[in-house]
Amino acid sequence: LQPMAIALASIADGTSMITENVFEARFRFVEEMVRLGADARTDGHHAVVRGIPQLSSAPVWSSDIRAGAGLVLAGLVADGETEVHDVFHIDRGYPLFVENLRSLGAEIERVA
């Protein structure tokens, strides 16, 4: 759940450190969070994230299920419209993801 935690940490007060000891490439998605304006960097098995008041919209690319979900959540709080590409990854793990977010009040649209 690191991508979701990093998305949250990117707009939270203070600095957060998230550690990943299993999957080496888990933090690849941090580069996409930086495209959204996140103040984040990786250092080996750690991601360090300093919270900022607001993310900005940008086109981003999902590399796996959890990264895609984290990018969508970050995009929902970003200023403007964010396009998340390669969302087929999300479909494998989160059926009805868009519909569930809409039922919670999210303004989200899936474009074919």
Swiss-Prot record:
Keyword terms, alphabetized: Cell cycle, Cell division, Cell shape, Cell wall biogenesis/degradation, Cytoplasm, Peptidoglycan synthesis, Transferase
UniProt superkingdom: Bacteria
Keyword Cell division recorded: yes
Pathway: Cell wall biogenesis; peptidoglycan biosynthesis
Family annotation (InterPro entries): Enolpyruvate_Tfrase_dom, Enolpyruvate_Tfrase_sf, MurA_subfamily, RNA3'P_cycl/enolpyr_Trfase_a/b
Record Pfam families: EPSP_synthase
Protein's cellular compartments: Cytoplasm
GO biological process: cell division; cell wall organization; peptidoglycan biosynthetic process; regulation of cell shape
Residues that coordinate or bind UDP-N-acetyl-alpha-D-glucosamine: 22
GO cellular component: cytoplasm
Catalytic activity line of the entry: phosphoenolpyruvate + UDP-N-acetyl-alpha-D-glucosamine = UDP-N-acetyl-3-O-(1-carboxyvinyl)-alpha-D-glucosamine + phosphate
Main location: cytoplasm
Stated name of the protein: UDP-N-acetylglucosamine 1-carboxyvinyltransferase
Provenance organism: Mycolicibacterium phlei (Mycobacterium phlei)
